[in-house]
Amino acid sequence: MLGQGLIFISLAFVAHALEIPISCAVSHNEQTEIFPHGTIDIPEMTFRPSDSQIDWSNLSHSDFVQCGVYEDSTNTWLAGASKYKIDEIKTLPKVPRDHYIILCDSSESNEIAKFTQVVHSFDFSSDSESAVVEQLHPSSPIPILTTAVRKKGSRPSKPQKEKQGNKQGSKTEESPNVDEDELESEPEEKTFFQKYGLYLIPILFLIIMSGNNANQQAANTAK
């Protein structure tokens, strides 16, 4: 769900660093553009955005965006990144805001070696555009990521049902609640007399009448 998509990022490479670089990628037509998004400072637990930020107004409705830790040397994300569809983000009344939760094994934030993961999501519950960085250790309560805020009176769009083709020979799944007696049976093939019987009756009648008239005329001629 939008606002709850999580990106789990391994932080083993920052064991001796004081910052976590965050990148964002915009995908469109199988082409992806990756640019620096900002840096998480440790132990200050703050986010410093880079000069190049996402311009949501210039993105197409078919684009996708994802953020996380990207390794330039291997051209890969260090962990699976959830994608957000721009079409859903641009219809929301508020500007998306970065929300980072840093997971660690200890309550001491200055022990960088204790940090294990970063959870990233887009937060739409606040008017503020500044990113939120939180720390979560074993004794901390589980954070609740807010969902996307919709305009008053709006309804979530329902997925459209796929149109069923009318091509002959296409197979359809039988509904479990439909009785077999209610299913239409295929029509039986008619015999020759069933198809043309109504036409043969008057023809036979005319043949018989013609034969009787011929016999009667022959009898009159013989007299």
UniProtKB/Swiss-Prot annotation:
Keywords: Endoplasmic reticulum, Glycoprotein, Membrane, Signal, Transmembrane, Transmembrane helix. Residues 149-188 are annotated as: Disordered. The chain crosses the membrane at residues 191-211. Glycans are attached at N58. It is found in: Endoplasmic reticulum membrane. It comes from the Eukaryota. It is a single-pass membrane protein. Residues 159-174 have a biased composition (Basic and acidic residues). GO terms for cellular component: EMC complex. Disulfide bonds: none annotated. Residues 176-187 have a biased composition (Acidic residues). This is Uncharacterized protein C19D5.02c. It comes from Schizosaccharomyces pombe (strain 972 / ATCC 24843) (Fission yeast).
